UniProtKB/Swiss-Prot annotation:
Subcellular localization(s) per the UniProt record: Cell membrane
Organism: Ricinus communis
Protein name as it appears in the record: Casparian strip membrane protein 1
Membrane topology of the entry: Multi-pass membrane protein
InterPro entries: CASP/CASPL (IPR006459), CASP_dom (IPR006702), CASPL (IPR044173)
UniProt KW Cell membrane keyword: yes
Amino acid sequence: MSTTIEIPAESSAVAKGKAPLIGASSSSYEKKGGYKKGIAIFDFILRLGAVISALSAAATMGTSDETLPFFTQFFQFEAGYDDFPTFQFFVIAMGFVGGYLVLSLPFSVVAIIRPHAVGIRLLLLILDTVALTLNTAAAAAAAAIVYLAHNGNQSANWLAVCQQFGDFCQKVSGGVVASFVSVLVFLLLVVMSAVALRKH
């Protein structure tokens, strides 16, 4: 007497239908990992650019001293960033921003190696937002003083100094432009981090 076990055709069809689903989910996971890794690599490149722009802004502003070639017995005409508290704040703030960006590079590398890590991406998003706020405040404040240096204010009897201190104004203007470049880079970094977290 022999015993035979019949396997229903439906169960075998279901079993056959499950195999492709596993492969599809694995393929989808790999595609998502490649997408996140691409974002992480672009994030690292943007951070390198932001480091250059932030430190360039601080260095340009910090070396903007100019002394006029003529002087009197009691006065020597010179202009420097340390004559303006706003420019002093700018140099300090951009120095902090540049230092943070340098320290964030290793975390960005970790995000490349582990593209699915949420903690690193969330930490960078929070710190990038703080640095963006500081960068924007410094750039906006310095831009207002640079405008006054170029154009003055007749209502307040503030004279434009850029006619006399051309090199000084050129350097501080360059520093402000570089700081706004880093603001734009930070905006891209924040948006990219938010997109990467949303796709998780």
